[in-house]
């Protein structure tokens, strides 16, 4: 899974956050993918982010969902930063 993966250090900080974290992260060791998406119905002063954790197939694509969770924007940013620091990689591919 080297195509479509970027090893970029992208950090989100509470004080300077413009947009919530969105997109896919991949952990090659565990074979897991996580998708961050904004919760469309959250109020602008109380933004929420969904995370959807997937098992990946041999091509590094989402195969089966493991769980979904709704987070505050602070929790989502903290989770994103911890995953990036832990070696998860940003996925640039668009999955269908």
Regions found by a protein language model. Give the residues of each.
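Terminus-proximal functional modules
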Residues: 1-96
């Amino acid at each position: 899974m080297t195509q479509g993966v970027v090893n970029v250090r992208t950090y989100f900080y509470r004080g300077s956050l413009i947009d919530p974290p969105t997109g896919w992260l991949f952990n090659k060791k565990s074979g897991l993918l996580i998708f961050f998406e904004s919760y469309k119905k959250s109020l602008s002063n109380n933004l929420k982010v969904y995370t959807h954790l997937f098992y990946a197939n041999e091509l590094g694509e989402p195969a089966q969902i493991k769980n979904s969770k709704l987070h505050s924007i602070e929790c989502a940013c903290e989770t994103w930063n911890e995953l990036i620091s832990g070696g998860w990689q940003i996925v640039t591919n668009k999955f269908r």
